[in-house]
Amino acid sequence: MNEPVIVRLTVNGAAREGRCPPRKLLVDFLREDLSLTGTHVGCEHGICGACTILFNGEAARSCLMLAVQADGAELTTVEGLMTDGALHPLQEAFREHHGLQCGFCTPGMLLTALDLLRVNPEPTEDDIREGISAVLCRCTGYHGIIKAVQAAAPRLR
């Protein structure tokens, strides 16, 4: 039961493969086996949102999933947002509107906001507040983050 298993998945558009114990968390697999350290480990209980990734296009907590559950899946981590060295429009908006301070929540916040904008391309401020409430930020007070999501919305339509 503890024999390593092969996990094959697509991460940030590239086919990836790794061997890991069957009970290894997806967040640890991403960080330790695939060297994608942008996904942060916060509470390890699915509460803080720092470990949020896109799993088959939808926001998901990677600390609540086993790596084997991602076999055959398509994942996007914060490292996958840039294209040819250029920041994603949402990342640009976060920079322009001071949507980060310490940066610990930023990867999870970006991917949560990206999923929100996929589902609701024209969110109200209340929609944004509700959508990002799944990610805890202890530094910004959320004002810059909300402004950044508002600014990014028309760029992504």
What are these regions (language model features)?
Residues 1-157:
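Signature of N-terminal electron-transfer/Fe-S-associated modules in redox systems
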